[in-house]
Amino acid sequence: MEWTDSLILGILQGITEFLPVSSSGHLELGKAILGDNSMPEESMLFTVVLHFATALSTIVVFRKDIRDILTGFLKFKWNEDTQFISKIALSMLPAAVIGLFFEEELEQLFGGNIVLVGFMLIITGLLLFLADRAKNTNKKVSYIDAFVIGISQAI
């Protein structure tokens, strides 16, 4: 992969990560448009590095909020911060389990399969449209909600 392709994909990742769209799906489309012919393992490594960079930049931007939440969590008392971190951890479980046990199958299924990636982006768009039209109850996220969010993210 040329450095210019890497730069373009890095910019694409940076723009789409914080939008309610699949940045991973857009990366796959971007790789296809740029004619990326790298091996699946190299492609996956590149995607992981981009996501790591995004996570690192997010930590830098939200460092004060993260510090406050961690400070509350480290008091070892059941409070709003410990509940928040518990819900985040619970929401990560489905993706972690699927990623650990089905990594190769997922890479074969989605890696370079632009038609499937495009179809999944359309499905995601429809779900976001329906969620936007749903009645807003302003309720707090429950543990069940956190788990369902994790399943949705894993899919």
Place the predicted regions along the sequence by residue.
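Multi-pass membrane proteins that catalyze or facilitate reactions on polyprenyl-/lipid-phosphate substrates
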Residues: M1-I155
